[in-house]
């Protein structure tokens, strides 16, 4: 079993809450908004749909949480050399922001 699969299997609510606590002062608590749509009401009757408005996050996406969590796990001595992200999109923006922090 690869290390990645092994790590994924370890993810649980306690870990998520622990990491949320670690980064809470650096991340924006973004709002949640109910979606009002007659089309969706017809498509999904008796449902409520909500959006988490991550566009208000520092990087404009939810990726900031993961990038910051991982960046903070890197030893300070190694982190001073920078962070590399294999991305040209939202994750790259978040990784750059996390490295800057």
Task: Name each region found by the language model.
Residues 1-101:
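PLP-dependent amino-acid enzyme catalytic core
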């Amino acid at each position: 079993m690869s290390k990645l699969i092994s790590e994924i299997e370890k993810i649980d609510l306690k870990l998520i809450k622990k990491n949320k606590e670690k980064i809470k002062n650096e991340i924006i608590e973004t709002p949640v908004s109910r979606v009002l749509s007659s089309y969706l009401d017809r498509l999904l009757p008796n449902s409520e749909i909500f959006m988490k408005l991550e566009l208000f996050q520092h990087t404009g996406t939810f990726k900031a949480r993961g990038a910051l969590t991982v960046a903070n796990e890197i030893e300070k001595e190694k982190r001073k050399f920078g962070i590399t992200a294999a991305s040209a999109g939202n994750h790259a923006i978040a990784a750059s922001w996390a490295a800057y922090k």
